Amino acid sequence: MAASLWMGDLEPYMDENFISRAFATMGETVMSVKIIRNRLTGIPAGYCFVEFADLATAEKCLHKINGKPLPGATPAKRFKLNYATYGKQPDNSPEYSLFVGDLTPDVDDGMLYEFFVKVYPSCRGGKVVLDQTGVSKGYGFVKFTDELEQKRALTECQGAIGLGSKPVRLSVAIPKASRVKPVEYSQMYSYSYNQYYQQYQNYYAQWGYDQNTGSYSYSYPQYGYTQSTMQTYEEVGDDALEDPMPQLDVTEANKEFMEQSEELYDALMDCHWQPLDTVSSEIPAMM
């Protein structure tokens, strides 16, 4: 049975042939591509639906190439893919996620997903967080639909090797307090990892968090609506992602503390009168 993926963030010049070639370049074969256009103006709405032979192929493609550079795109863009629901109600089954830290730059979404799904079948996706230039920030998230498997993964994979070149560091990703929003359309699918935060602070905080690619929520109506109506992005900054176990260089911290203390001491001493040369020296007049 054929299955489709939603593909967004398209430029006007990206037609069916361009999309098909882009997938072919990544080693994926698509059955068809449907570019959605505004019903009144005929202008492309900025998204399309890509059909695959079956659901397994579509899922494999989603995990393999989502977030990777889009071949031939000018300016440079990345694949922005999601499941297409075609009128089905959103999947409201509970999700249990893990924060995955200490990821090396070579780890992508597909590798993260495959590392967990081969042992924990309820794993539903993996997301490596990227900066604005597309470089990994060194951490990501994985989702599970089975809480027991999430807990097993947390225990069994803590410090595991085989995902990149460093042992992985895991902690529970805690969902933020949910914000109630009206559902305007029945055709909606949420695929956001920005709803999670960590219970400790300053995970790579020096880089800042302005993540705009590969992590989003959207809703799309029936064909013919404009892109602004079709797609609503969650404005949730990545500054909410925090470090479960920050590294502290004790030696460096002590050095900085001593330097600051010496500066304070010198400043205090400079506020006093200068010492007299001898006991018989004349005391300077007050200014």
From Swiss-Prot:
InterPro entries hit by this protein: Nucleotide-bd_a/b_plait_sf, RBD_domain_sf, RRM_dom, SECp43_RRM2, TSAP1, TSAP1_C
Swiss-Prot/TrEMBL keywords: Cytoplasm, Nucleus, Protein biosynthesis, Repeat, RNA-binding
Molecular functions per Gene Ontology: tRNA binding
Compartmental location: Nucleus; Cytoplasm
RRM domain: residues covered: 3-86, 96-175
Keyword Cytoplasm: yes
GO CC annotations, alphabetized: cytoplasm; nucleus
Transmembrane segments: none
Keyword set includes Chloroplast: no
GO biological process, one term: selenocysteine incorporation
Family of this protein: Belongs to the RRM TRSPAP family.
Record function comment: Involved in the early steps of selenocysteine biosynthesis and tRNA(Sec) charging to the later steps resulting in the cotranslational incorporation of selenocysteine into selenoproteins. Stabilizes the SECISBP2, EEFSEC and tRNA(Sec) complex. May be involved in the methylation of tRNA(Sec). Enhances efficiency of selenoproteins synthesis.
Subunit structure: Component of the tRNA(Sec) complex composed at least of EEFSEC, SECISBP2, SEPHS1, SEPSECS, TRNAU1AP and tRNA(Sec). Found in a complex with tRNA(Sec). Interacts with SEPSECS. Associates with mRNP and/or polysomes. Found in a complex with EEFSEC, SECISBP2, TRNAU1AP and tRNA(Sec).
Name of the protein described by the UniProt record: tRNA selenocysteine 1-associated protein 1
Organism this protein belongs to: Bos taurus
Gene expressing this chain: TRNAU1AP
